[in-house]
Each structure stands twice: as C-alpha cells, then as structure tokens.
C-alpha cells in the first residue's frame, strides 16, 4: 500500500456542520481562525479502511499582543464514511484538545 496524506491542493474547505463550535473555541482561547479541509481518500491508500473521507486541520497559535501567528501547535486528521461524520469527528477532537490544553497551561503556569 502507498503512503498517503491529504494534500492542500486537493482539499475543499468548509465552515458547515459543527465548525462554528471550533471557531468559537479558537476565538475564545486565542488560536488562528480554523480552516477545516476535507477530501476523498483514494482506494489504494493505507488508511482507506478508516473511511472514504478525510477531514484535516492544522491548529496555529496567535499572540495576544501583536496579532501575529507564532506557529503550528498541532494537526488533526479524522476519517469517516461521509464528509459530515469526518468533519464532526475532527471538530470534536480539536475542541477537546483545545480545552485540555487550556486546562494544562493553567495548571502548569
């Protein structure tokens, strides 16, 4: 099986489904406005057994003082058999991570 990953040139972007929940979390905790992309997974790809569609997001941090972005925090990828399921799964994972990271940063200063 071939190595496969979602490529930016093949992604379509959405703000439908539950992406507004992710946008709210990013705004609240000072992350760059999210761009959720999705694409079809090729039939020859190693991850095809996870689902026919892939949703992806790269989470960027943002400085409060200068309104500049300070780089990649992490990336998320979710697979499912429909675009809606993949995007919803991705949003759930990303919001959960953002909430967890906020709690950990508060605990450890």
From Swiss-Prot:
The organism of origin for this protein: Bovine coronavirus (strain 98TXSF-110-LUN) (BCoV-LUN)
Family affiliation: Belongs to the coronaviruses ns12.7 protein family.
UniProt name for this protein: Non-structural protein of 12.7 kDa
Species lineage: Viruses, Riboviria, Orthornavirae, Pisuviricota, Pisoniviricetes
InterPro entries: Corona_NS2
């Amino acid at each position: 099986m071939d190595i496969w990953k979602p490529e930016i040139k093949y992604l379509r972007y959405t703000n439908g489904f539950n992406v507004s929940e992710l946008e709210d979390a990013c705004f609240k905790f000072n992350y760059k406005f999210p761009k959720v992309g999705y694409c079809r997974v090729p039939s020859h790809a190693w991850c095809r057994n996870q689902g026919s569609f892939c949703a992806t997001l790269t989470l960027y941090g943002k400085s409060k003082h200068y309104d500049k972005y300070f780089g990649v925090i992490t990336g998320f990828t979710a697979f499912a058999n429909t675009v809606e399921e993949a995007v919803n799964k991705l949003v759930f994972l990303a919001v959960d991570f953002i909430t967890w990271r906020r709690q950990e940063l508060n605990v450890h200063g």
